[in-house]
Swiss-Prot record:
Active-site residue list: 88 (charge relay system), 145 (charge relay system), 248 (charge relay system), 248 (schiff-base intermediate with substrate)
Pfam families (UniProt xref): PS_Dcarbxylase (PF02666)
Keywords: Cell membrane, Decarboxylase, Lipid biosynthesis, Lipid metabolism, Lyase, Membrane, Phospholipid biosynthesis, Phospholipid metabolism, Pyruvate, Zymogen
This enzyme's EC code(s): 4.1.1.65
Site (Cleavage (non-hydrolytic)): 247-248
Family: Belongs to the phosphatidylserine decarboxylase family. PSD-B subfamily. Prokaryotic type I sub-subfamily.
Cellular component annotations (GO), alphabetically ordered: plasma membrane
Purpose: Catalyzes the formation of phosphatidylethanolamine (PtdEtn) from phosphatidylserine (PtdSer).
Keyword Membrane found: yes
UniProt-listed GO biological process terms: phosphatidylethanolamine biosynthetic process
Catalytic activity: a 1,2-diacyl-sn-glycero-3-phospho-L-serine + H(+) = a 1,2-diacyl-sn-glycero-3-phosphoethanolamine + CO2
Residues that bear Pyruvic acid (Ser): 248
Protein name: Phosphatidylserine decarboxylase proenzyme
């Protein structure tokens, strides 16, 4: 019962109205009020500001500027691995995709096709492949970086719900990551095609990518797609590719037989940007 009540409340709260209001507050310049909000947030979630490029809270004029703060140079060195962790956060789940089914939590799976917005051809590339679901808590650094070199092929904005994506909700809401609003980014990399899915959540005001800027809002209620195959848009391993304006989850997809996850990985473990995530398969 302890977990059922907060999940039930997720169905009752006006998710979109709450998210729009949070976005309005976070993007506004409210002077001393903004500073007070940030200061309280830092205390509540024990945010380590010594890692930030700008550690002085008073220098942030908007909450969003604080939330998407850059790290100081050298704060996240890259491991020597084919795939490095793209975010600071925690491992929600990872492992094999069983045919087209991705494990969310005990008793809950969702399909790769649903996750990528219904594109059967794209989903088929990851049948029996590998996935990693990474949760970013409020205290974490909220920029997303490239796990490896990649050439951008396509971006899809998939409209959806705005449930919270914390571990309790992941255990209680069926198909959570395939029903929330999300941005699907398709790349070609050294180990083959891969996808990074930025999943929205309650009070996630917007998601942005470095090549497009803010993707949402607007929220048109329909699927939107951008193609980049003819633009030779390439990003290097460790380079920023996007950010959450208020936190969420990233789901990464890799083809069958293309990666071996680091043996130290396990669900619930804290991870940091740049640490080893996976390696090329053994020959």
């Amino acid at each position: 019962m302890s977990e059922r009540l907060p999940v039930l409340l997720q169905y009752l709260v006006p998710q979109r109205a709450l998210t729009v209001f949070a976005g309005f507050v976070a993007s506004g310049r409210w002077g001393g009020i903004t500073t007070a909000i940030i200061r309280r947030f830092v205390r509540k979630y024990r945010v380590d500001m010594s890692e930030a490029a700008e550690p002085d809270i008073a220098r942030y004029t908007r909450f969003n500027d604080f939330f998407t703060r850059a790290l100081r140079p050298g704060a996240r060195p890259l491991a020597s691995a084919e795939l490095v962790c793209p975010v600071d956060g925690a491992i929600s789940q990872f492992g094999a995709i069983e045919r087209d089914q991705i494990f969310q939590a005990k008793g809950h799976h969702y399909s790769t096709r649903a996750l990528v917005g219904g594109d059967a051809e794209l989903a088929a590339r990851f049948q029996d492949g590998q996935f990693a679901t990474l949760y970013l808590s409020p205290r974490d650094y909220h920029r997303i970086h490239m796990p490896c070199d990649g050439r951008l092929l396509r971006m899809i904005h998939v409209p959806g719900d705005l449930f919270s994506v914390n571990p309790v909700t992941a255990r209680g809401v069926p198909g959570l990551f395939a029903r929330n609003e999300r941005v699907v980014c398709e790349f070609d990399g050294p180990l083959g095609p891969f996808v990074l899915v930025l999943v929205g959540a309650t009070i996630v005001g917007s998601m942005a990518t470095v090549w497009h800027g803010q993707v949402n809002p607007p929220r048109s209620g329909r699927l939107r797609e951008w193609r980049y195959a003819d633009r030779e848009l390439r990003l290097r391993q460790g380079e920023e590719m996007g950010r959450f304006l208020l936190g969420s989850t990233v789901v990464a997809l890799f083809p069958q037989g293309s990666v071996r996850f680091d043996p130290g990985w396990e669900p619930g473990r804290a991870v940091r940007l740049g640490e080893a995530m996976a390696f090329a398969p053994l020959l």
